[in-house]
Every structure is written in C-alpha cells, then in structure tokens.
C-alpha cells in the first residue's frame, strides 16, 4: 500500500488509511483499494467529486446509496464502514471484494455447475429478501452489481437506483439494465417493487445455469418485445427442478410471478441450504442490540474505552472505534468460514448467552439494548415466519368504476381540484382557503412547530397554502381493490386531517 502522501490530495480526509491502486474509474469519481491503518484490513474507497456529481445530477443517486447501506448489516450486502465529507469530495469507505464482479466470473467460467449456481443464488435471494423486509427494492440487480469476496461469497452492491418502498406508493421510474428489467418496468407501468427484483433474480439464475441471457438482442425494440412477451428458451441440460423454478420467476404478469418466500420454499432452492440462510433474515433493530464480545475486546485492546464503544455501537454512530469494530468483526468471520453469516450468528448466540448468564452478577456485562426480547432466541427459531401482508391503502371488493365515482363525489364535497393522471390515478390539490381547511390549519398550527410538519424543502417559517397529493386505485392478489392516498407537499398533520374528512365522505369502502 502506498502512503498518504501519494493519495492525490486526499491525505487529510483519509488520514486513517493508506491508499493503494485504483480499482476502477467512473464518470464522477474513482474506487481505490486502501488499508485501514489501525486494523491492517483492506477496504474499498469510493472517491466522489462533488462538482462532477452536481454537473451530472448524480448527487441524489449517491445520497440514496449511502442512506441505504448505512441501514444494512447483512453477510450478502456490501458493508459501509464510514462516509467522510469534504467541500470537494465524498469518501465512501466500503467492504473490499477481492474477486470483483459476478459478471466477470460468469464470463470466465461460462455456465456454472448447478450446486455452485445454487449456492450463489441462495446468497443473492438472502440479500434481496433482507432489502425487501427493510422496505428497499434494489431495481438494478445484475451480475455487474453483485461482487465476490475472498471466499467467493456474493455481496449485493450499487444501491444508487434503489428506492425505499412506502406503504401505498407505487414506483414508476424505469431503472436498471434492459436485459434484466421486468416487463412492467420497460413498459412504464406502475409497480410495487419486490416483484421487479424477483424478475431480475430469475434472469440472473438463468445466466448462472446457462452462461447466457434469456432475453438478448442488439436491437432494443426487439429486446423489449421478447421481454414483454416472455419469449425465451430453456436449454435441455437444466435439471427438472431448475426448469420449474425459472419460468415461475420470469412470469410477465407481476401478480402471478413467484414471490421471494415462494422461491425460498421451492425444492431446488432448499437443496444444501446453509443453516444461516434457512433461519429468518436478521432484523435491523435486533442487530443494533447485539455486540460480539470478542471483537469488542479487540477494539478495547486498540486503546478505546469499552463503554464508549458499546454506546456508539448501540446508537449506530460512525467514529474511529465503530469503524475498527466492524472491520475486525467482518474479517474475523470471513477468515474462519466461507459463510460469514453462519459463524457470525453462532458467535453472537454464544456471546449473548454468556452475557445473559452473567447478568445477575453485573449489569455492565450486557451489551445489547434494554427492551429487547431474548437475545439468542431469534437465531433458534426452527420455522420460517409467516410473510407479512402489507395492506396498502383502503381495501374494497366494490367494482373500480363504483369506487372511483364515490372518490370523485368525496373530492367534490371537499372542494378538491383534481387532474387525471392515468386510468385509475389522479393528482389532487386542496387549498387551505376553504373554511374546513382553515379550521384544521388553526388547530394544527396552535400546537405543532412549522418545521416538524413541513417537508425538508418547505421549512420557510410559514405553512404552505395548499396540500398536494395523489390518489391511486389498483388491484391486489386476493381480488380486492386498494385505494391509496400519497401526500406530495403540504403539512403532514393537515393532510391527515383531510384524510379523515375524506374517509367520512366515502360510502363504498
């Protein structure tokens, strides 16, 4: 590794690292390998130039990836260790993946043996499921965004196109590479999110087992035609179970497409499934409560105070101590097993059991947050939990036309201006100039600070004059129709008051 003096002007910001060679160069930055001085472990550092990002309007993409990766701790999602901001650059310190992209691995080896393809696919599904359970849809899953560490384990990366899913809000932005994009995405239709990632996983599984893509054509219109029609062929060398699973994932109708849970339960997926992938995915709230005692002691040995480290970890703070902790933790378990998650989970169970047994002797030996459930129970659950069913909006079995008629009547009664945005989608505007709105505004404003009920961009010392929102009707899997209202701008509490008034006007739901 080269010293800081040769870091190209990054020495002050990256004083805790020795910069090495450049791994890749992009349009608004580069990725370098580096060594963390304190622990000696390698990391990858994205160096993003702020001015170039602004010029290319890519700031939001970078912010989105940082926000998501800060939330996630999973053995098959790339780890974010810290983010360093300077006036000119943003430095994103991430897990280093020695063997690069899965894409290059497939190109080099061609189609994989079924057992190896299954191992990789199991890890991908584990990471994708974790994203979905934390209300994040990746939207750009492809072998180029799947990295391989020193043990050839998969790490989901590049969350720049990802979206946080909100209850009742569909996505419409067309993201990702055309070859891996679902039919509803390239058609510009509204989609909820998870089913899009399922389609991309189906394309990736096909590529792993066949060494080629199911949908490929140099002519983009022809490519789109194949995707929209679900036109592809299954090679004869595929096993019967693989031939059953792939078509279930590549179903054109997203409502009929297999779900992540159903993939998990499929017989092909279950073969040689590692124990740590067979148990429920870890919960981010529970993860923050668990601290590995051995790794904690290693950090203390580096000169950090134990209580300070514990408090920082509990509160998910970024500082030198927590960066060292996670680097040591990841590299410890990566060195002992190809499956980081299995050793990680078993070690945490051992340490947390040790903490629990010594609780009566001293409360200071417990390093998980108060209020948590049995700290070692989650890893011992024998059965996969029932999948959560999200109710997005108001459910009704009435016919769409009948529902929309009642919606329009309610909007008219409340003096709402609306504009058709699609067959069952409309943009609405409600002015606070009307008596009922003014009354609500007075009530809310009397006890709520403006900055609390504003959007970030609306904090200007006064309440906006209007509420803008969208109404959308869509069909669910169980033959029900769901009516959703999504606030765009305006005071949150006033919007909730409007929703209550709107509900009283509806007679069909």
Swiss-Prot record:
Disulfide bonds: none annotated. ATP binds at residues 23-31, 46. Strongly expressed in immature seeds. Mostly expressed in panicles, leaf sheaths and roots, and to a lower extent, in germinating seeds and leaf blades. The active site is at residue 140. Residues 290-330 form the UBA domain. GO terms for cellular component: nucleus. It comes from the Eukaryota. Its EC number is 2.7.11.1. It is found in: Nucleus. GO terms for molecular function: ATP binding; protein serine kinase activity; protein serine/threonine kinase activity. PROSITE patterns: KA1, PROTEIN_KINASE_ATP, PROTEIN_KINASE_DOM, PROTEIN_KINASE_ST, UBA. It catalyses: L-seryl-[protein] + ATP = O-phospho-L-seryl-[protein] + ADP + H(+); L-threonyl-[protein] + ATP = O-phospho-L-threonyl-[protein] + ADP + H(+). Residues 17-269 form the Protein kinase domain. Gene3D superfamilies: Kinase associated domain 1, KA1, Transferase(Phosphotransferase) domain 1. Residues 460-508 form the KA1 domain. Keywords: ATP-binding, Kinase, Nucleotide-binding, Nucleus, Serine/threonine-protein kinase, Transferase. SMART domains: S_TKc (SM00220). InterPro entries: KA1/Ssp2_C (IPR028375), KA1_dom (IPR001772), Kinase-like_dom_sf (IPR011009), Prot_kinase_dom (IPR000719), Protein_kinase_ATP_BS (IPR017441), Ser/Thr_kinase_AS (IPR008271), UBA (IPR015940). Disruption phenotype: Normal expression of MYBS1 and AAMY3 in response to glucose levels. Normal seed germination and seedling growth. Interacts with HDR1. Suppressor of flowering in long days (LD) via the that up-regulation of HD1 and the down-regulation of EHD1. Can phosphorylate HD1 in the presence of HDR1. Belongs to the protein kinase superfamily. Ser/Thr protein kinase family. This is Serine/threonine protein kinase OSK4. It comes from Oryza sativa subsp. japonica (Rice). The gene is OSK4.
């Amino acid at each position: 590794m080269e010293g800081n003096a040769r870091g190209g002007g990054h020495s002050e910001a990256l004083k805790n690292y020795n910069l090495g060679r450049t791994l890749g160069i992009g349009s608004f930055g580069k990725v370098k390998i580096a060594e963390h001085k304190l622990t000696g472990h390698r990391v990858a550092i994205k160096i993003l130039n702020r001015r170039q990002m602004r010029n290319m309007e890519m700031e939001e993409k970078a912010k989105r990836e940082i926000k998501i990766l800060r939330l996630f701790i999973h053995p098959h999602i790339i780890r974010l260790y810290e983010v360093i901001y300077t006036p000119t650059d943003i430095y994103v310190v991430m897990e280093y993946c020695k063997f690069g992209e899965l894409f290059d691995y497939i190109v080099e080896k061609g189609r994989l043996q079924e057992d190896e393809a299954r191992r990789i696919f199991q890890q991908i599904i584990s990471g994708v499921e974790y994203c979905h359970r934390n209300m994040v849809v990746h939207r750009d899953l492809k072998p180029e965004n799947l990295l391989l560490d020193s043990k050839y384990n998969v790490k989901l990366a590049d969350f720049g196109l990802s979206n946080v899913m909100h209850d009742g809000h569909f996505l419409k932005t067309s993201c990702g590479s055309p070859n891996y994009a679902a039919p509803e995405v390239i058609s510009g239709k509204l989609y909820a999110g998870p089913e899009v990632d399922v389609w991309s996983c189906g394309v990736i599984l096909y590529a792993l087992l066949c060494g080629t893509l199911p949908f490929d054509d140099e002519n983009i219109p022809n490519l789109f035609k194949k995707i929209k029609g679900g036109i592809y062929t299954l090679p004869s060398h595929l096993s019967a179970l693989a031939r059953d699973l792939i078509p279930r994932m590549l179903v054109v109708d997203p409502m009929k497409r297999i779900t992540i849970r159903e993939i998990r339960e499929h017989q092909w997926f279950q073969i040689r499934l590692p124990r740590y992938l067979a148990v429920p995915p870890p919960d981010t709230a529970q993860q923050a409560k668990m601290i590995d005692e051995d790794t904690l002691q290693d950090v203390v040995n580096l000169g950090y105070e134990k209580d300070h480290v514990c408090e920082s970890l509990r509160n998910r703070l970024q500082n030198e101590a927590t960066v060292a902790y996670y680097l040591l933790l990841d590299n410890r378990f990566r060195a002992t097993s190809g499956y980081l998650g299995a050793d990680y989970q078993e070690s945490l169970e051992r340490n947390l059991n040790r903490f629990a047994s010594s609780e009566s002797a001293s409360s200071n030996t417990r390093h998980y947050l108060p209020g948590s459930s049995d700290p070692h129970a989650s890893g011992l659950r024998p059965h996969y939990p029932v999948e959560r069913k999200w109710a997005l909006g108001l459910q009704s079995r009435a016919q769409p036309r009948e529902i929309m008629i009642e919606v329009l009547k309610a909007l008219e009664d409340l003096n709402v201006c609306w504009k058709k945005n699609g067959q069952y989608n409309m943009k609405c505007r409600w002015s606070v100039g009307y008596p009922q709105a003014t009354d609500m505004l007075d009530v809310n404003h009397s006890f709520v600070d403006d900055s609390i009920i504003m959007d970030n961009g609306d904090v200007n010392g006064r309440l906006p004059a209007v509420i803008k929102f969208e109404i959308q009707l869509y069909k669910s899997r169980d033959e029900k129709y769901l009516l959703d209202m999504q606030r765009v701008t305006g005071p949150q509490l006033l919007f909730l008051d409007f929703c209550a008034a709107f509900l009283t006007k509806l007679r069909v739901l």
